């Protein structure tokens, strides 16, 4: 309903409005809240609101939110199969949205393989 009224919406973490600093867990919680309200939130919509949607909500979409040339490149590389259960679930994914949905609902810190800040690798999981 909020989106229908053209309100800018972003999904992010800051603990004040959620329960975790982990973006994947926040996406999972947003999905559950939408379900409880009788609304649907697809994996693609969730990813949008966590990236470009969030940048637009903060009026930073000229600098952040996607991989367009000239934008700041702060991003994480995710391992969709970080745990045995996730690997099993990903084997049964019916497509990219299903794979993203599984990551969104089962993911946590273990899925972060690498972190880049301004395009420079800042962290790699051992």
Go through the PLM ranges and name each one.
Residues 72-126:
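C-terminal cap of metal-dependent C-N hydrolases
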Residues 1-87:
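His/Asp/Glu-enriched, well-ordered alpha-helical/loop segment
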């Amino acid at each position: 309903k909020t989106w229908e009224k053209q309100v800018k919406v972003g999904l992010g973490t800051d603990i004040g409005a959620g329960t975790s600093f982990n973006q994947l867990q926040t996406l999972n919680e947003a999905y559950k809240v939408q379900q409880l309200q009788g609304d649907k939130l697809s994996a693609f919509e969730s990813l949008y609101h966590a990236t470009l949607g969030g940048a637009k909500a903060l009026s930073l979409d000229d600098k952040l939110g996607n991989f367009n040339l000239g934008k700041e490149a702060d991003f994480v590389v995710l391992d969709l199969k970080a745990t045995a259960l996730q690997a099993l679930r990903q084997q049964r994914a019916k497509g990219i949205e299903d794979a993203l949905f599984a990551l969104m609902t089962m993911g946590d810190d273990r899925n972060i393989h690498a972190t880049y800040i301004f395009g420079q690798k800042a962290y790699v999981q051992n």
